[in-house]
Amino acid sequence: MDTSRPEALDSEPGVYKGMTQRQLDWAYDQANHAANRVQVLEQIAHKSALSRQLLPEPLRLSYGREPIEMLDWYVSEKAHSPLVFFVHGGAWKSGTAQNNALQAHWLHQMGCHVVIPDFDAVSDVDGNLSHLARQVQNALLYTYQTCAKHGANPQKIIVVGHSSGAHLSACMVTRDWRGLGLQEHPISALLCCSGMYELEPVSLSARSQYVRFTPEMVQDLSPQRGTEHFKMPVALLCGDQESPEFIRQFQEFSESLKLKHPRVTSHWVQGVNHFEILETLFEPDSIHARALKALMEDSI
């Protein structure tokens, strides 16, 4: 299969930043930018299983009424310790908490709690991406409210996300929390890896075949449009073998945040694609892991 960038035909109009529809669809389809994606995803699931084998069974807790609204909580024995809340990716339509625990072993060894929520696939909720954002928000609220019960420090919640999970993680900063009883989000630090932060181009791409984008959703769920809210330490990561659109999104979000907030770092990871960069999180000395450790120290 030819995965190279389609050449624009004279008859094709530009859809976004000079890209034709075919070029935009190509840019937002990870199959075109990571030929080894199936193998790497299998490795991520395998390493998650290895990580879980090194740990006590997590608590399986309900944060909502729906059967999918459950989370895995790897409890630390260290009192009043930090908590890492990880939001998995999967183009908003795949992924599980169980298969995204590859970082849990070394975080647990450091004395951290690790929480990984499950939530709906957008294709199972009529393309309603706002529903997923509400689920992740409810999972984070539940985690915050029960920190003391499980020995975690509610003032040290570090939210981490990859791909579409990075998008949802960043949305947690810009969402309204007042209706949930909080004046603002409970996030002490944020790490976003290989995410999307402006939904306009995504809404024009083939992803609109399974996400029911509306102008209101694009406005509400585009963290790029709410950079004034990112006052906590933030780390952004991107692999240099990513899709050009994911690279552009990383660069523009980084630049926008750095103009307003001094506690923002950005990290290029050499030689890795969209999926390989997540796999590196298994190793506690990887750039990905070191960025997370630095965030945890900076958020004190």
PLM feature spans:
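Alpha/beta-hydrolase active-site loop signature
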Residues: A91, F119-S123, Y197, N273
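Catalytic nucleophile-loop/oxyanion-hole region of alpha/beta-hydrolase
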Residues: G95-A104, V115-K156, E283
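Primarily recognizes the serine-hydrolase "nucleophile elbow" in alpha/beta-hydrolase
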Residues: L141-S205
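Short beta-strand element of the alpha/beta-hydrolase
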Residues: S81-G90
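N-terminal cap/lid segment of alpha/beta-hydrolase-fold proteins
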Residues: Q23-A79
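The feature captures the conserved acid-bearing segment of alpha/beta-hydrolase catalytic domains
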Residues: Q183-E184, A189-S203, P215-E252
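Alpha/beta-hydrolase
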Residues: V87, C193, V269-V272
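C-terminal catalytic histidine-bearing segment of alpha/beta-hydrolase fold enzymes
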Residues: I247, Q251, K258-I300
